[in-house]
A protein has these predicted regions:
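Short, surface-exposed, charged/polar-biased interaction segments
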Residues: 45-48, 81, 121
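Short, acidic/charged, Gly/Pro-enriched secondary-structure junctions
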Residues: 71-96
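Solvent-exposed edge beta-strands and adjacent loop segments
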Residues: 1-64, 89-116
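Short, conserved charged micro-motifs
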Residues: 67-74, 128
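Hydrophobic lipid-interacting interfaces of membrane-associated proteins
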Residues: 120-127
Length: 129
C-alpha cells in the first residue's frame, strides 16, 4: 500500500491590493457554517436543512512586515480588507475580505514582528496550479 503524502505549505503571506505586505510563519484555520432546519406543516422533525453562511477564523503566528511595507508606513492596526495567501505545491488558498480581530505584539529592539493575529475572512478561494 502506497503512503500518500499531504502537501505542506510553501509560503504564507498577507496581501493588500495585490501587494505582499507581510510574511507569516504559521497559520491555523477554523471554518464553521450555520444551517437552518426546514419544517413542513404538521411535521415534528425537519424535512431538510438549508446551508447558511460560512465563517473562517484564522490564527496567524509570527508576522513580519516586508521592507517595502515598512518604508510605506504599514500599520497593522489600520489594515482593512486584506487577503491571506497560502501557497501549497498543487494550489493556492486565498482568504479574502479579511479583518483583524485581535493583535498580540512582541518584539525585540530593532525588530518588526507581530507574534499572533486573529483574523476573520469573508471568503475562501482555491486556485489549482
Amino acid at each position: 500500500m502506497a503512503i500518500r503524502k499531504i502537501p505542506t505549505t510553501a509560503d504564507i503571506y498577507l496581501e493588500v491590493d495585490g501587494v505582499r505586505v507581510a510574511v507569516v510563519q504559521s497559520y491555523k484555520v477554523t471554518a464553521s457554517r450555520e444551517s437552518k432546519a426546514i419544517y413542513a406543516f404538521g411535521q415534528s422533525e425537519p424535512v431538510s436543512t438549508i446551508r447558511g453562511q460560512s465563517q473562517y477564523v484564522l490564527e496567524l503566528t509570527r508576522l513580519y512586515a516586508t521592507d517595502e511595507a515598512i518604508r510605506d508606513g504599514l500599520n497593522f492596526c489600520e489594515m482593512d480588507d486584506f487577503s491571506l495567501v497560502v501557497c501549497k505545491p498543487d494550489r493556492n488558498v486565498i482568504y479574502t475580505g479579511c479583518q483583524w480581530k485581535s493583535l498580540q505584539e512582541s518584539a525585540e529592539v530593532g525588530g518588526n514582528v507581530l507574534e499572533k493575529v486573529t483574523v476573520e475572512a469573508g471568503r475562501r478561494i482555491e486556485n489549482l496550479l
